Amino acid sequence: MTDYKDTLNLPQTDFPMRANLPEREPQTLARWQTLDLYRKIRKDREGQPKFILHDGPPYANGRAHLGTAFNKTLKDIVVKSKTLSGFDAPFVPGWDCHGLPIELNVEKKLGKDKLSANAFRQACRDYAFSQIELQRDDFQRLGVLGDWQHPYLTMDFGYEADTVRALAKIVANGHLLRGQKPVHWCAACGSALAEAEVEYRDKASPAVDVGFEAVDAEAVRQRFGVKNATTRVLVPIWTTTPWTLPANEAVSVHPELHYALVKSELQNQPVYLILAKDLVDSAMQRYGVDDYEVHGNLKGDALEGMQLQHPFLDRIVPIILGEHVTTEAGTGNVHTAPAHGLEDYFVAEKYNLPINNPVDARGRFIPDTFLVGGQPVFKANEPIIVLLADSGHLLHSETIQHSYPHCWRHKTPLIFRATPQWFIGMNKNGLRERALAEIEKVTWLPAWGEARIGKMVADRPDWCISRQRLWGIPIPLFIHKKSGELHPKSPALMEKVAQLIEKESVDAWFDLDPKVLLGDDADHYEKVTDVLDVWFDSGVTHFCVLEKRRELKVPADIYLEGSDQHRGWFQSSLLTSLAIRDKAPYKSVLTYGFVVDSQGRKMSKSLGNVILPADVVKNLGADVLRLWAASMDYTVEVNVSDEILKRASDAYRRIRNTARFLLSNLYDFDPKKDKVAVDQLVALDRWAIFTTQKLQEKIITAYDRYRFPAIYQAIHNFCTVEMGSFYLDIIKDRLYTSKESGLPRRSAQTALYYIAEAFVRWIAPIISFTADEIWQFMPGDREPSVFLTQWFSDFPNAALSGEEEQRWQLLLQIRDEVNKALETYRNEGKIGSALTAEVVLYADERLNAAIATLGEELRFVLITSEASVLPFNEKSKAAFDTALPGLALEINVSEFEKCARCWQRRSSVGQIKEHADLCDRCVSNAFEDGDMRQFA
């Protein structure tokens, strides 16, 4: 048999079938760096409309985890898609560099007491730099394009100085307050602790039920509908910290819980108790009472304002409403000491209750405290319990074991203690109302984000922006020693401090002799040594970065972070921006859910479900990780597992195989010389171009709306359905067997060229390494990188009429039914390949109209050796119905010989003596002028 291989146009390309991403991606990265790609993009887009995605700074501690990898990938997808849309979309990454975790790491390595404050801060700075280098490498390895050589760092001297300037504007605009707020306090350390310094251990504590007596018992009884009674009314609270009772200022109830008035006898005296209805039985059991009556039923909000007598102090306290009250334990009535608990503080703030803190920095009661003056707080429990028992206010007492916060250094129990702090006042100069109004002007994605942040801002207390730590940006203020007032020239003084910090770092403030700035007035003023909350540091990036860098602008077009940032960065940025310039720093905000495992569990070493991005990149490649990120519905929790990543890897392979098919059939195609005019295109090729053009419109719209999973799905379907199992499958015969430079093949190549030009750009924002690799193998002259182009727009006018579109849609369905039938026959051993079959289609008028025009070329669409169409009502006995109404099929095995070149079984095989093993079409294509195609 003659070998006709040399007469075929078999696919050929140097684009590798095996991706080998872990080795190949670093080569692409090196090429981008040699090319200085980011700078080239900036130069190329100069003068174009700006699009600014502002990077929320990750914390400079530890390698990138899957959450930060997901974050940076989504941002990169947005920025690259906007670049392809023609925008000038610079991306300036940043890092959050101050704060406790860095302090702790440095302290573990070097010790805090062994270093001077300045040396300790320098060690923190050095540590942060080392972590930034690690994370920068991680993010660049993911293919994220940005100004990595000039990121913003909250510890840069210039940034620290500008943060002081931002605070100065907030001071000048009248938003700064001084007040007290409870914090975790370690008596052994003599200082406040942050959450990261707190560890929870079991502790034995006294658990007591204490009765607060209603001042106007009759009015209370009447509220519950009880008349003609003289019995006293008690409101029992349950607490494990009796030592905090001297600081009690209220009793909290939940506005929506139902409360009952319970008549009983305690300590041989009749009494009415107000208890949460759901806790009546458990409370009465605790009090050892079996005989009791439940009277009335009121919601908690009906109890608001009721006056109670403090159990041992000459103090009247109100019942107030608090959402923090639960029915998990206790009585439904919560002892509220604003100086000793955050929830107590927040709820008390709404009622303007005093912050009464009788405990000093050593954890002892101040000397004039009733009964327990001078005693350590935990030793004060016993005398307080004895006093309550003697006065008849102790309803129950026991010792319980429970989880309690301890100092991570000393392993001793902590207390909550109110200390002087600096706040941004939510109700000063209408900040809260302006924030709520501005929230409505921002586009929130998903839309529920608006209600979420709106409720948080509506309910939040003043923002405590001060911390008592070493590693942070100072709050450079002077307070009058007698009046407690700020220096009247504070904003101007802060500018002078900012200029010093710009040159010498924050040490300039801590080392500063107040006389340098205040002269003789220095004796009357105290220098503040607090530092700023790190949320303030990152919250003023709109001022320190967006406003200061020439390539950026404020407001940013979008902030994109995890949904936890409604409480964090989105809010701190909004409040500082309003306090500075009375405008939100962003036009839109996009949030995503937490990255969890396939069962919805958080990543945890103890669960053994931690997946490190570095491991994924090392084993599968960054593009697989990026494809996973794009495929996930980010509006909910984002699942990841080895199995999910394997599916992403499989999907990646389909995309790569599609690209390889396109490239391998364009090896001899020069778009300048070989493109076929639209009016000469084979109908199927015109349909393919039209379909590609239509899909591109949908994909660009999806990119503009940040609907990444829809893009992933569209590209996946394009590779597997419209192209993979339909168009590309059909045109293989034409590409391989038609005359090399004949119209049928050049028509198909023209379509493939347009598809490739569009396709490589669609995938570029998502699988960037692969897209740029494909780009290097594309035919024709082009820019050195796909990211220096825009969405492909040089499509011919291949528009189809509605009728033509409908016809091709029907052909897709018909081919699907034929394929299913052929597969069944193949599985049953009735036929070999589809080319051994001849198919008769029995079609109704609607389907007949769609396929009759194809005539002889129908077999190319169905990839069978023969295909004919007959009316539906002429079905033979051998025919069978399909799932498509109006279509029946009859499949027979061809009795003709197989063509040695195209493998179709045709009656013309053997008819031409010189080429007895070829069909007439192959003789024409191999040795004559070639066949012609009109439809397929």
UniProtKB/Swiss-Prot annotation:
UniProt binding sites for Zn(2+): 899, 902, 919, 922
Reactions accelerated catalytically: tRNA(Ile) + L-isoleucine + ATP = L-isoleucyl-tRNA(Ile) + AMP + diphosphate
GO molecular function, one term: zinc ion binding
A GO CC annotation given for this chain: cytosol
CDD domains in alphabetical order: Anticodon_Ia_Ile_BEm, IleRS_core
Key words of the record: Aminoacyl-tRNA synthetase, ATP-binding, Cytoplasm, Ligase, Metal-binding, Nucleotide-binding, Protein biosynthesis, Zinc
Protein's cellular compartments: Cytoplasm
Keyword Repeat: no
Enzyme class (EC, first level): ligase
Superkingdom of origin organism: Bacteria
Functional summary from the UniProt entry: Catalyzes the attachment of isoleucine to tRNA(Ile). As IleRS can inadvertently accommodate and process structurally similar amino acids such as valine, to avoid such errors it has two additional distinct tRNA(Ile)-dependent editing activities. One activity is designated as 'pretransfer' editing and involves the hydrolysis of activated Val-AMP. The other activity is designated 'posttransfer' editing and involves deacylation of mischarged Val-tRNA(Ile).
Subunit structure, interactors included: Monomer.
The protein's name: Isoleucine--tRNA ligase
Gene (name only): ileS
